[in-house]
From Swiss-Prot:
HAMAP family, per database record: RuvC
Primary gene name: ruvC
EC number(s) from the headed UniProt entry: 3.1.21.10
Annotated organism of origin: Chlamydia trachomatis serovar A (strain ATCC VR-571B / DSM 19440 / HAR-13)
UniProt function note: The RuvA-RuvB-RuvC complex processes Holliday junction (HJ) DNA during genetic recombination and DNA repair. Endonuclease that resolves HJ intermediates. Cleaves cruciform DNA by making single-stranded nicks across the HJ at symmetrical positions within the homologous arms, yielding a 5'-phosphate and a 3'-hydroxyl group; requires a central core of homology in the junction. The consensus cleavage sequence is 5'-(A/T)TT(C/G)-3'. Cleavage occurs on the 3'-side of the TT dinucleotide at the point of strand exchange.
GO MF assignments: crossover junction DNA endonuclease activity; DNA binding; magnesium ion binding
Cofactor dependency: Mg(2+)
Compartments it resides in: Cytoplasm
UniProt-recorded name of the protein: Crossover junction endodeoxyribonuclease RuvC
Length: 170
């Protein structure tokens, strides 16, 4: 039995998503991935509507066991923080309306799970995720958001396995 975990790297212009298949608790394989591209010409409310609609469709089609997002962090520009927070809210709503549990991890936790160090660059995450999952397409410059989404999903898979193993040892 395989479980699907969906990682989402939220954004107000580009939102990367990636689904991994976890088989027998230990084997992780890429399932599907992509980007939701939001037009800068659209009003913010219409971008959020498009994001909600497209992610909701993917959730319905794929039926993941979990959705994984980055925790909110503060940008230098307060407006960017607010807009990203609203995009995260849209994603939380899309998942909760379909009864998919949402898990959140700090960016450095996801980077550590994928690369081995929490302060890894986006390029390092991209390279390592591409190698670990054998997805050469991730190395394209505009696929950083997808690589981050894969890293989030992998982080959750690893931490869930760790929690399961801890339970068996107690």
């Amino acid at each position: 039995m395989a479980d699907l975990i969906m990682g989402i790297d939220p954004g107000t212009l580009v939102c990367g998503y990636a689904l991994i298949k976890v088989e027998n608790r230990y084997h992780i394989h890429p399932h599907s991935f992509g980007k939701v591209k939001l037009s800068q010409k659209l009003a913010l409310a219409h971008r959020y509507k498009q994001l909600f609609t497209e992610i909701s469709t993917i959730l319905q089609q794929e039926s993941p066991k979990a959705v994984v997002l980055e925790t909110q962090y503060v940008h230098k520009n307060p407006q960017s923080t607010i807009k990203l927070g609203m995009a995260r809210g849209v994603l939380l709503l899309a998942a909760s309306l379909q009864d998919v549990p949402v898990f959140e991890y700090a960016p450095n936790t996801a980077k550590k799970a994928a690369v081995g160090k929490g302060n890894a660059s986006k390029k390092q995450v991209q390279l390592m995720v591409s190698k670990l999952l054998r997805v050469p397409d991730l190395l394209a410059e505009d696929n950083e958001d997808i690589a981050d989404a894969f890293a989030l999903a992998m982080c959750h898979a690893h931490l869930a396995l760790y929690q399961d193993l801890k339970k068996t040892l107690v």
